[in-house]
Amino acid sequence: MTNTKTLKDNISFEEALRELEEIVKKIDTGQENLETAVNSFERGILLKNHCEKKLKEARLKIEKITKLADSTVILEETEV
């Protein structure tokens, strides 16, 4: 795990979320010393912000698609 001040934009939402979950587990269980925990917390904030950015981008893309779509679009539930 690198602890840079910024995240590369090419890290996927899923990768960032997975790493964030690992950080939370480590901090919650007290597996890290104070300095490492603070660095992990800082990394966690970066990951959280990255995930929020990715979610916002996805939401805006969906809204744009919805606005461009014909108003007769019908959403149907499908079974998996």
Curated annotation (Swiss-Prot):
Subcellular location: Cytoplasm
Keywords: Cytoplasm, Exonuclease, Hydrolase, Nuclease
Chief location of this protein within or outside the cell: cytoplasm
Enzyme Commission identifier(s): 3.1.11.6
Gene3D superfamilies xref list: Exonuclease VII, small subunit
Gene Ontology MF term list: exodeoxyribonuclease VII activity
Catalytic activity entry: Exonucleolytic cleavage in either 5'- to 3'- or 3'- to 5'-direction to yield nucleoside 5'-phosphates
Keyword hit for Lyase: no
GO biological process, one term: DNA catabolic process
A Pfam family: Exonuc_VII_S
Domain of life: Bacteria
SS bonds (residue pairs): none
Single GO cellular component term: exodeoxyribonuclease VII complex
Enzyme class, spelled out: hydrolase
UniProt subunit comment: Heterooligomer composed of large and small subunits.
Function statement: Bidirectionally degrades single-stranded DNA into large acid-insoluble oligonucleotides, which are then degraded further into small acid-soluble oligonucleotides.
Assigned protein family: Belongs to the XseB family.
Matching NCBIfam families: PRK00977.1-4, xseB
Protein name as catalogued: Exodeoxyribonuclease 7 small subunit
Organism: Rickettsia prowazekii (strain Madrid E)
Lineage: Bacteria, Pseudomonadati, Pseudomonadota, Alphaproteobacteria, Rickettsiales
